């Protein structure tokens, strides 16, 4: 089994990411082997598929444009005030729902900013947003089993094992690392679902069609490094260094933050937000002729449809994991 040229099936690498092949109706195709395959390489079997979610919900606290980099590779605090101009600031947080437009882009509701934005007559080289590290996905996904004899439907969770060719998110919470246990009060004291192939530990349900359990599933980004076991046991990697993104517009980085939105998180429990920074590929030049500043959200690959195998070797959908949304800043 492979998930990319020369890569082991369960290897955590860039070659193991990306979308899966779908049919004309958008259903993920299950190959004769009983597994989905890569959208570009039919010989590359996958245990997850990066797809475009139907709905993506996030709480935003701050947004700004900067004349120098707000991201730091070290230090206990972030500084996005000295060299940045805020275009959005809401201490309580504003819940934004992003709706897939069918091409990887999204519309935001409500609008992030009401009214005019006052920016300096400057050249901005960086941008940032501060958001909750609780990312929510509401998504349904169909599967095409016509090319395999291994099974006729996907297994999922709920009150008991569910089966069908359509699977959807339900109101449960998981972490990026699929940790076990219960969070502390900073994260709502919620029970975490590990996605181990049992009904109780799944954040999804399957059937012939979506039912009344269809809801937002929550994914907590608790660390940017490796973690295992129970919540709070593993140490936290609070920084994700700059790397390219599918939406373009520059390289992106992130830092986990405490509730004051300035101190770098040191534990899973005190890490409740994250700063998303962009090193702009083309600096934004704001002058007297600038009439428009826009923020675009990209959802391509922002839901990770994750699978495992049950003891009887049935393919089981464990969760629709939320990956950080892509953000593009433009001015004209």
Segments the model singles out, each with a brief description of its role:
Residues 2-8, 13-332:
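A short, solvent-exposed, low-complexity linear motif enriched for acidic/polar residues
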């Amino acid at each position: 089994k492979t998930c990319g040229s020369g890569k082991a099936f369960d290897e955590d690498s860039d070659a193991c990411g990306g979308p899966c092949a779908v049919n004309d109706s958008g259903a993920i195709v299950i190959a004769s082997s009983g597994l989905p395959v890569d959208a570009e390489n039919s010989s590359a079997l996958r245990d997850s598929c990066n797809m475009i979610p139907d709905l993506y919900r996030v709480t935003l606290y701050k947004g700004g444009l900067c004349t120098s980099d707000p991201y730091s590779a070290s230090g206990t605090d972030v500084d996005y005030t000295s060299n940045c101009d805020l275009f959005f600031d809401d201490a309580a947080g504003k819940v934004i729902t992003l709706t897939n437009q069918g091409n990887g882009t999204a519309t935001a509701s409500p609008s992030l900013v009401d009214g005019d934005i006052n920016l300096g007559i400057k050249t901005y080289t960086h941008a940032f947003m501060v958001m909750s590290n609780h990312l929510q996905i509401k998504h349904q996904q169909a599967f095409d089993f016509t090319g395999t004899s291994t099974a006729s439907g996907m297994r999922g969770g709920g009150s008991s094992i569910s089966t069908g060719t359509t699977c959807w998110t339900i109101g449960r919470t998981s972490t990026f690392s699929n940790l076990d246990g219960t969070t502390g009060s900073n994260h709502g004291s919620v029970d975490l679902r590990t996605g181990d192939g049992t009904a109780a530990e799944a954040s999804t349900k399957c059937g012939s069609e979506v039912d009344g359990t269809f809801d937002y599933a929550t994914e907590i980004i608790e660390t940017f490094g490796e973690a295992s076991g129970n919540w709070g046991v593993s140490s936290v990697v609070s920084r994700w260094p700059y790397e390219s993104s599918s939406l373009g517009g520059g390289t992106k980085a992130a830092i986990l933050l405490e509730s004051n939105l300035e101190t770098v998180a040191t534990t899973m429990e005190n890490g409740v937000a994250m700063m998303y920074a962009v090193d702009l590929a083309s600096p934004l030049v704001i002058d007297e002729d600038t009439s428009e500043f826009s923020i675009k959200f990209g959802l391509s690959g922002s839901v990770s449809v994750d699978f495992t195998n049950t003891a009887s070797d049935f393919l089981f959908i464990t969760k629709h994991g939320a990956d950080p949304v892509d953000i593009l800043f433009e001015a004209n």
